[in-house]
Amino acid sequence: MKSKKLYLALIIGVLLAFLTLSSWLGNSGLVGRFGVWFAAINKKYFGYLSLINLPYLAWVLFLLYRAKNPFTEIVLEKTLGHLLGILSLLFLQSSLLNQGEIGNSARLFLHPFIGDFGLYVLIMLMVVISYLILFKLPPKSVFYPYMNKTQSLLKEIYKQCLQAFSPNFSLKKEGFENTPSDSQKKETNNDKEKENLKENPIDENHNTPNEESFLAIPTPYNTTLNNSEPQEGLVQISPHPPTHYTIYPKRNRFDDLTNPTLKEPKQETKEREPTLKKETPTTLKPIMPISASNTENHDKTENHKTPNHPIKEDDLQESPQENPQKENIEENIEEKETQNAPSFSPLTLTSAKKPVMVKELSENKEILDGLDYGEVQKPKDYELPTTQLLNAVCLKETSLDENEIDQKIQDLLSKLRTFKIDGDIIRTYSGPIVTTFEFRPAPSVKVSRILGLSDDLAMTLCAESIRIQAPIKGKDVVGIEIPNSQSQIIYLREILESELFQKSSSPLTLALGKDIVGNPFITDLKKLPHLLIAGTTGSGKSVGVNAMILSLLYKNPPDQLKLVMIDPKMVEFSIYADIPHLLTPIITDPKKAIGALQSVAKEMERRYSLMSEYKVKTIDSYNEQAQSNGVEAFPYLIVVIDELADLMMTGGKEAEFPIARIAQMGRASGLHLIVATQRPSVDVVTGLIKTNLPSRVSFRVGTKIDSKVILDTDGAQSLLGRGDMLFTPPGTNGLVRLHAPFATEDEIKKIVDFIKAQKEVEYDKDFLLEESRMPLDTPNYQGDDILERAKAVILEKKITSTSFLQRQLKIGYNQAATITDELEAQGFLSPRNAKGNREILQNF
């Protein structure tokens, strides 16, 4: 039996040794594929503890092997101690380094219930219990010293609080002076008093008190006045000993509180009051000002308890003489308290006033509350993508140092004061990318002076760029947004899994990212109803557009949403090729793009004609009636244009007019535009397009002029790039700063493959016209006669635009465009130039 146990131990030891070497040398390839695989798995689940967990396990198994009976209570208790130690290390590693799948999973499960503080308390508790179990330490030897220290500390704090808030508080009366050294000192003094009392009786009319009761008094009630030295906490009245002492046995201090005689009005009759009256001008000297009045009251209480002394009228007349003494003592107390009151200095009040840290912006919450929320019905024959297709969110958070914020506030205020701009920081709020300081200037400061200091403040704060909102809409403060020293990555999965996105009932919900305090932010494309996006190279424009497209794919099946993607650069939308949501193949030719826009405008007219028959105003109302009448419902049709500048350069007015028509009338019929451009200049974003696309998103642009073109104000040139953007919500005049979420190409491919595996794409062949041409056999086309009329009009007016022919010949826009292309094919007109105009060929 022993040999079998030994062989089993050797096999386990060799196996653990091999696995330990695999964990150490897995990446070197010396331990084979299995070793590399095991090292990766071990590090994934245990993090850095994977280097020591197997040797630790081997040591525990060796202790179990040496034990005669491994199932005894002591062995099981030690095993539990080892297990708690390992778990505490896993939790600590996960909290500090975010390593180890086991610790991360447990921490994520416990965090919503107990928070970060509870996790650290749990870790400390596990470490303490493991330490006590493994080292066989009784709890008394560990906790009792700390309990005694804690009790002493609480007692001292309680004493200080009573001294601060109760002017009649006495240390001896409350029993706080019963330390061993004081007790010994009192016993010595009591022994001396005992000898004096034996030699000299107190009074002829009174019996000598019991010696045992005198010696057994440890409380301050038996404090006597000694001739040799003044007692602590008393006022030295006279160098001569008093004429009378009254000594009482030990009494509980709570008996005094319940004694009805103490609640009666005290008569201030003392036998030593004549001495006080005579000696006060020369011998009144407070030793402890705080307890002087308390001692006097205590003496009054003792004399009040003596029933053998008659009250004389002379004494009652002399008692008011104590008032000057009390006033003198109180004056000394007030002087000393005034000298020892540094906590009420102006410096302390100034340092205690700190800006308020804001976790949620009220203006953003108001915008989000205006969206529609509710339950969304899941499609029957289609499975929406899950967030599991996206990469897991890295929980590594860059905690913002409050000292860094305080330093920035000091630098900011000092720099503003150099320009004679006074004010104070009222609120601060920090997010994943920037920290915003709300600066309230003095009444004499002009806001325009602060706007011109962005470069100076950026240099002072060593920031890449700062953005100044002067002022913030609806507030009396100026917003100064400063980049954080360490920025966080915002993942698309965070936004899609947020409560806002999950509970949004609109199928056209767009995930825009996070706001400047780190809260998710979404919007509804139906309420925008169109979106104009601008941003230079590297600003994160493509990342933001991809996040919007993916959020639409996460909400809608193919029969509810159709997309028309126009990608003149041929690389931005190629990853979405052949998804079942596409109405046409991804359009890369500008001429085909113009034809697609014209077809969308024609589809809009068709929808409105059908909606007028059913007497409805919106697509939602039409779809409800269509479902009840068995008619095909209208899907939402989203046109996504990646580069408007190339389209405008090629098509000019021919591209501008259909975009304007769709933007003007497409909302009620379920047609929406998402138009992006890299160059938001005046010739690209024309006044007609700006007027019909009120909701805009601007990533970082090159100049202030571009910012004013896209946003009608500056500020976009000061953005940080990498998804940092400004958004104009519908119905408001203000700007909302957001940070777009990031999704990798691999994540997009996973989502696209998941969608394509469920349903194949079905393109509408009649929707996309070849080179924006209508067939010559259209119903309203009259052949060569109308061509001759078109030539005559062009030669007479010298105008070659399609819209001009449309007005002169009184035909549709699509037919006029077809005639123009036919004239170009015949050589009558030249191709469009850079401005989108055609010329009449002279050699015709």
Curated annotation (Swiss-Prot):
List every stretch annotated Disordered. Answer: 173-325
One GO term under biological process is: cell division
Q: Where is the composition biased (Basic and acidic residues)?
A: 183-206, 263-280, 296-314
Q: Which residues bind ATP?
A: G538, S539, G540, K541, S542, V543
Q: Which residues lie on this side of the membrane: Cytoplasmic?
A: 134-844
Task: Give the matching InterPro entries.
Answer: FtsK/SpoIIIE/SftA, FtsK_alpha, FtsK_dom, Ftsk_gamma, P-loop_NTPase, WH-like_DNA-bd_sf, WH_DNA-bd_sf
Q: Which residues cross the membrane?
A: 6-26, 45-65, 71-91, 113-133
The FtsK domain is annotated at 518-708
UniProt keyword terms in alphabetical order:
ATP-binding, Cell cycle, Cell division, Cell inner membrane, Cell membrane, Chromosome partition, DNA-binding, Membrane, Nucleotide-binding, Transmembrane, Transmembrane helix
Any one GO MF term held by the record is: ATP binding
Q: State whether keyword DNA-binding applies.
A: yes
Q: Where in the cell is it found?
A: Cell inner membrane
Q: How does it sit in the membrane?
A: Multi-pass membrane protein
Which regions are flagged for Polar residues bias? 220-230
Keyword Magnesium set for record = no
Q: Which GO terms describe its cellular component?
A: plasma membrane
Q: Mainly localized where?
A: membrane
Pfam families referenced in this protein's UniProt entry, alphabetically: FtsK_alpha, FtsK_gamma, FtsK_SpoIIIE
How does this polypeptide assemble, per the annotation?
Homohexamer. Forms a ring that surrounds DNA.
Relate the protein's function as given in its record. Answer: Essential cell division protein that coordinates cell division and chromosome segregation. The N-terminus is involved in assembly of the cell-division machinery. The C-terminus functions as a DNA motor that moves dsDNA in an ATP-dependent manner towards the dif recombination site, which is located within the replication terminus region. Translocation stops specifically at Xer-dif sites, where FtsK interacts with the Xer recombinase, allowing activation of chromosome unlinking by recombination. FtsK orienting polar sequences (KOPS) guide the direction of DNA translocation.
Please report which protein family the annotation says this sequence is part of. Answer: Belongs to the FtsK/SpoIIIE/SftA family.
Q: What is known of its domains?
A: Consists of an N-terminal domain, which is sufficient for the localization to the septal ring and is required for cell division, followed by a linker domain, and a C-terminal domain, which forms the translocation motor involved in chromosome segregation. The C-terminal domain can be further subdivided into alpha, beta and gamma subdomains. The alpha and beta subdomains multimerise to produce a hexameric ring, contain the nucleotide binding motif and form the DNA pump.
Q: What is this protein called?
A: DNA translocase FtsK
Q: Which gene encodes it?
A: ftsK
